[in-house]
């Protein structure tokens, strides 16, 4: 019933302690394990079947193993269930350094100054990077399949922050302890700016403008109204004529929940320069 397998070991350990008496409160018993992939139903079914014991079913004979239609057991299935399968960040890389990011405590602010002297003095610190070290090139953190689907609206380390947690400095050190200690010593002085937290308010006249200066060339439709993309007449035909010819029209404002297709496993990649100077990821 699992898909990515990241939550499987925790689910399996918890499920191993359950009895038939726990089934009426199964969701509460399993609340300490989160799963992004399954919607939990197949996990409930599997646990219930395991707790209740084998059930004799009537029906057609099972398909012979190895034939067409037979279940295929993934090569890593047993290792994943047992928590033995290494994930990307479980693999040690010889000579690797540790990076920690300092995030903004403000939703919208301009950085006045950053004092990194104390952080650089921590033993084991290799570098402390800020917007003064970052290229001026802008990009998007949207990360869709094609880069041009998203606006060029921020630098990798920007001198203006637009959400709580946006990175303002990066500490690189030989150990995690040194990186953590140095990150706590980075002192940032902010000029706090007005912030906006509602999409309708963001489009109203007088709302704080988050990306002034961005243009359609940056793939920002209307920076003065905080609008990154919009559809106009001409997309899909003559909208006014079609509505006029319709037997029934319905108007209103509809809202839907946000969907994030995000796995539980930390986003991670391992990269290095090979002997030919090529970046391998």
Regions from the PLM with identified roles:
Residues 1-17, 31-45:
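Local cysteine-cluster metal-coordination motifs and their immediate loop/turn environment
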Residues 2-4, 167-170, 278-281:
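Short active-site oxyanion
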Residues 16-21, 48-52:
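Short cysteine/histidine-rich zinc-coordinating motifs and their immediately flanking basic loops
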Residues 24-30:
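Short, well-structured alpha-helical segments that form the helix of a local strand-helix-strand
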Residues 48-222, 249-252:
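Flexible, low-hydrophobicity surface segments
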Residues 120, 128, 233-242:
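Predominantly extracellular/luminal regions of secreted and cell-surface proteins
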Residues 238-281:
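Conserved beta-alpha junction segments in alpha/beta enzyme cores
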């Amino acid at each position: 019933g699992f898909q990515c397998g990241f939550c499987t070991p925790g689910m399996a350990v918890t499920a191993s302690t359950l009895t038939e008496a726990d089934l009426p409160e199964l969701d509460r018993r399993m609340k300490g394990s989160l799963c992004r992939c399954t919607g939990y139903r197949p996990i409930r079914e599997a646990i219930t079947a395991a707790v209740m014991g084998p059930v004799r079913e009537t029906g057609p004979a099972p398909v012979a193993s190895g034939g067409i239609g037979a279940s295929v057991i993934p090569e890593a299935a047993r290792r994943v269930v047992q928590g033995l399968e290494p994930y990307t960040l479980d693999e040690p890389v010889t000579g690797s350094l540790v990076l920690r990011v300092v995030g903004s405590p403000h939703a919208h602010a301009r950085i006045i100054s950053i004092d990194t002297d104390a952080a650089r003095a921590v033993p084991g610190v290799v570098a402390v990077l800020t917007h003064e070290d970052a290229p001026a090139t802008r990009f998007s953190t949207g990360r869709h399949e094609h880069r041009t689907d998203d606006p060029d609206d921020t630098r990798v380390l920007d001198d203006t922050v637009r959400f709580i947690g946006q990175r303002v400095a990066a500490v690189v050190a030989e150990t995690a302890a040194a990186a953590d200690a140095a990150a706590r010593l980075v002192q940032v002085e902010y000029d706090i700016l007005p912030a906006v937290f509602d999409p309708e308010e963001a489009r109203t006249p007088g709302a704080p403008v988050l990306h002034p200066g961005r243009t359609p060339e940056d793939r920002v439709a209307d920076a003065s109204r905080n609008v990154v993309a919009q559809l106009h007449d001409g997309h899909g035909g003559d909208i006014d004529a079609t509505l006029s010819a319709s037997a029934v029209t319905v108007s209103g404002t509809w809202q839907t929940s946000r969907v994030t297709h995000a796995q539980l496993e930390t986003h991670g990649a391992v990269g290095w320069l090979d002997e030919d100077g090529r970046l391998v990821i």
